[in-house]
Amino acid sequence: MCPSQHSSLKDIHRQLENTAISNPTENADPSSYVDGSNIMDFKHPSIVSSSASSSYPISHVPSVGTRGIPRSYSMASAYPYQVNSNSMDASTAFNLNQDVADKPMLARNSIDSSINTELGPLESNHWFTQAQDHSRQYSSSWDPSIDPFEVKNSLHDSTDLSITHHPHLPINHQGNTWKHANESLQSNQGPVPNTKFVGLETTQTDSYQQSSVNSVVKIEEADATYALREESGQFNTFTGAENPSISPHSLNPNFPQYTEKPALTLLQSPKQNSNYDTSNFQNSVSDSSMQFTNEGMPSPVKGIMSSDDAVAFNFSQYSTVYPQNAPENGNEFETPNKLKRTVSSPCASISSKRSYGDIAQDCSYISSKTNGGGPSDSPSSSSTSVRGSVNDSNSPISSSATFAIQSNGVEPVGLSTQEQNLSPLSKRSAHNMIEKRYRSNLNDKIAELRDAVPTLRSGYNSTTADELKGTYVPLSRKLNKATILSKATEYIKSLQSKNKKLIEENKILQKRLSEYTSVIQASLTAPSQPASLSLLGPPGNTPGHRNVPPILKRSSIGTPSQQAYFPDAPHNCHSVPQNSSYPRPPMQVNRSPIDSMQTIPHANFNEMHNAYSSRYPLKYSKSCNAVSHTSMMHPQEYGGSLPSSTVPSDYNQPQLVSPRAQADQQGLSYKNVGRAVLNGLVGLETVHMLTNPDDAGSSNRFSMSVLPISPSLHSILRFLLLLLAFLCFAMHILLTPEATLRKWASSIYLSFRLECVFISFLIFSVPIYDWGNYLNLRGKLLSELNLESGVAT
């Protein structure tokens, strides 16, 4: 409203008061108005023309306080609504008077927060008592069938018409509060005294702040047109509940429809607080951040109401669209004595080109104190929480406002800012805690990896190979994560290469094992006599093969006891152990012992024996033992162990043997024993090579997996067999007649017995080539069995 209009209205108001004092009407009886009798005697004070202003009933002039607020009122002066016509003609005013005279409560719909500068709060319930009595009288004569909004068209065109209201009557833009006030008046309870309206934004007028909401237009349009629009279209005060079919939009399509539900809250007015000055109290809504700032108030309290400084609310920067369908019978407010109401703040439709995120707005806390003359019997401490949201269809803005109101004091109540929202410091602390936990977990895993790698393990002793390869890391060096990861990678690669090599070696060993197993199975399943049984030696003369291998033909070693080891030889006395892996089918040939004995396997051996026999001829000897080759080779001289049927009769006669021949015979016997021991040793090693091919490369290693003796015992047995062979050859040399002539040999033997045994075995042994045959036989067996010199370890 422009200042000229405002000043003119103030002048009109003062003129009406002076006129009422100087020219009281004849119908105006102050006593009648004080006790509430006969209110129909005067014109309705809501709308009075310029000519009828002199008949306005005023009982007395209200006393004006220090700030221009009247201290007491009569019924006429305290009646809440006055219509001042400055430019309207008398006929229009009278027509309005005739339409509204029967509906005095219609004027409650009008709102103008900038005109009523002379009215103020009451300090008693005197006016409410009078208002209740007059309301009961008018309720019987008021006709609800008359449309209260018919007046809006005539009032809408009046530019200087201003309708004021008393600040203590409750106003609700949805009709709920007016309905509550009307019900209170008709039920003799009266409206809630000393109440004001609380919103999100406050402005201050010249001398008085009146509660209102700029619902349709901006604050610059807060004039009579604004008040008439609210009266004519938005608030269905009385017909909203009784006649829901009537809506402001149906009466006037120019007014906007309801799209959002606005809300205001009723708060009891606190006591006067002269310590607080509201001259600098301002609230602003920032378009960029939507934060509510209060420059004139200390934090966190953003506003405190008092009886002298009422708070008016508007939205100067945004337009508000109200909901189309207001609740009819809903009442969001509890009884006044509880003073605990929860409503939603008005929702504004904000047009903005920026894209905002969801913003939680922290609003201030407002504390108020109830008046002593209020309806509550005893003061009670209660708080009211009001939350509002501002949403925009174009940009996702969410704004919530929270008010905590204390009804019995002026101290602000509410939670601290840290409890409302997490501060950036607390968020940063939570983030740091998560990062610290992540780092500690990572360091633990790195430490486990360091202990798993041998080159990084604590207390690891490096070898020369590690130092040469450069894989050793000194313990004094501080390890970092990069070093640990690199060494772990190298260790994994080395394990992979070793694993690959072991897999290849395992394949080779599996192949060899299959070959050895097949050889052993072939030797055991041969149709000839098994080697195990041949080692025990079957008794008697077993006929052998006619075809003897060349390697066996070169051997001249053999005794009758050797037929247990080599049954396949042409003669048991001249056989050499044969590999059991070369079985041959037996050839049964009917041969006489004479024919078999005439077979000489080795020429050199025969020549040697012929020399011995020519030197020491023996005509006949029954003492020829089983180990004598001469008796077998020359049965005519020695007779041997032949059957009597095959030996001539003259051979059966006893013959004389010289002592020299007897010594020679004994020497030959010792020699034959030595040869037999060597042959047995060869057979024993051959069996071990067949049963344990892994140890075939070394002649000193035998894993006795088959025989029930340990490897150490086998080594001792082998050494004893060799020693026995040496002794046999030594005894052969010493017992011969030629040996007795060499006394120096005996002295050497007595002095160096052990050395003499080995020397005599290697030098003085006549069949020294037998050792060569033994080595050749062993090499032949190894080559034919496809046995390598050893297995790589």
UniProtKB/Swiss-Prot annotation:
**Subcellular localization(s) per the UniProt record:** Cytoplasm; Nucleus; Membrane
Which modifications occur after translation, per UniProt? Undergoes proteolytic cleavage by rhomboid-type protease rbd2 and is released as soluble transcription factor from the membrane.
Which residues are recorded as modified (Phosphoserine)?
A: S344, S345, S355
Which GO cellular component terms are attached?
Answer: chromatin; cytoplasm; membrane; nucleus
The membrane-topology field of this record reads:
Multi-pass membrane protein
Which GO MF term does the entry hold, naming one? DNA-binding transcription activator activity
Q: Name one Pfam family in it.
A: HLH
Q: Name one GO biological process term.
A: positive regulation of transcription by RNA polymerase II
> Which CDD domains does this one have?
bHLHzip_scHMS1_like (cd11399)
PTM-bearing positions, type Phosphotyrosine:
Y356
Positions with biased composition (Low complexity)? 376-400
Region of interest (Disordered), residue spans: 323-351, 367-400
Q: Which spans does this entry mark as compositional bias, Polar residues?
A: 323-334, 342-351
- Where, by residue number, does the polypeptide cross the bilayer? 719-739, 748-768
Q: Which residue intervals define the domain bHLH in the entry?
A: 426-495
Give the InterPro entries listed for this entry.
bHLH_dom (IPR011598), HLH_DNA-bd_sf (IPR036638), Regulatory_TF_Diverse (IPR052099)
Q: Which UniProt keywords apply?
A: Cytoplasm, Membrane, Nucleus, Phosphoprotein, Transcription, Transcription regulation, Transmembrane, Transmembrane helix
Briefly state the protein's biological role.
Answer: Putative transcription factor.
What's the protein called, per UniProt?
Answer: Putative transcription factor sre2
Origin organism lineage: Eukaryota, Fungi, Dikarya, Ascomycota, Taphrinomycotina
Q: Which gene is this protein's source?
A: sre2
